[in-house]
Structures are given as C-alpha cells and as structure tokens.
Amino acid sequence: MTGSGDFLENLPGRWIAGGILAIYFVALGVRTVVNGRLADFTAVTWAGTTLAFVLLAIAMTVTASSATSALADWQAGVVCGAVVIAVAAVWGSAALLGSEALGPFQTMLSTATIVLVVFMMRGRLLLAWVVVAVNTVIGVIVGPLTGSPTWLNAVLPRASFTMLFIATGAALLLAP
C-alpha cells in the first residue's frame, strides 16, 4: 500500500473495486436485455445500446484501473471519447425507437454519470466538465427526437447531478 492511501493503488483494493465493477456491469447488462425485450428494441436500437454498454464498460475499466491517482492523457482521451459516443448512441437509440418512454435507456445514462464522477475523482476535473457539457448538448439536440414528452427530465437532472459532484470534488481538491 502506498502512502497516498488511494484505495485503487493497493492490490486488495483493486480486486474489490474490480469485483464491484464486474457485478455492476453484469447487472447493467441483464437490466438492459430485460428493458430491450420489454420495449421491443429493433436491431438498430440493440446495436446502439450494445455499443453504449461496451464503451461505458471500457471507460469505467480505464478510469478505475490506473495504478496512479491521476489518469494519463491517453487514458483521459479514451474515457472522454467513450462516454460521449456512448451517450450519443443511447440518445440515438431512443430516438430511433421512437418510444415515448425513456425508461429502457435511463440506466445507460446513469452509468455515464457514474463514470464521469469516478473520472473526476481521478484528477480530470476540467475534462469532466467538458464531457458533461457535450453530453448535455447531445441530450438537448437529440432528446426531442425521441418523441418522449419528458426527454428534458432525462437531460437536466443528470447534468445538474454530475456538475454538483464535480463542483464538490473541485472544492475538496482545492481546499487547504
């Protein structure tokens, strides 16, 4: 264990975190399949949702697997790109399905928020803000195309929630 006390820097901590992430993504996969079956996903919707799932799993793995507190530039680039493309794929899938219910897609959008919170805690505050802004713009542009009268409810709370965590993290990191 190193002197910094970073949970992910010690081997047992990494195994525990990896196990928790594996359980989370198995549960997310099961929930996505059940939601897709109930919502009668089309082949294109399945493809978009599967792409989002894979990209979010990659983003979380890269974010959580670094042995140091701060992520390297290439890791940050992978995470940012994966989260933005995943969010675009989720919103695009919802729009293509034309369903008024966004429920089947909420877990993926929530997972993107979780990835960004962990990303912020790994020393990438500014990039986390940029990704939140880009994801919010994607939701505002594509959200109306879903046909759901409550699409904005899926965009703004996540943006606010993520920004709250980022602001809190920034305050903690900048505090004396």
Language model segments and positions:
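Alpha-helical transmembrane segments of integral membrane proteins
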Residues: 81-89, 103-141
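Membrane-embedded alpha-helical segments of multi-pass membrane proteins
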Residues: 51-55, 107-112, 160, 164
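Hydrophobic alpha-helical transmembrane segments
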Residues: 18, 128-130, 156-160
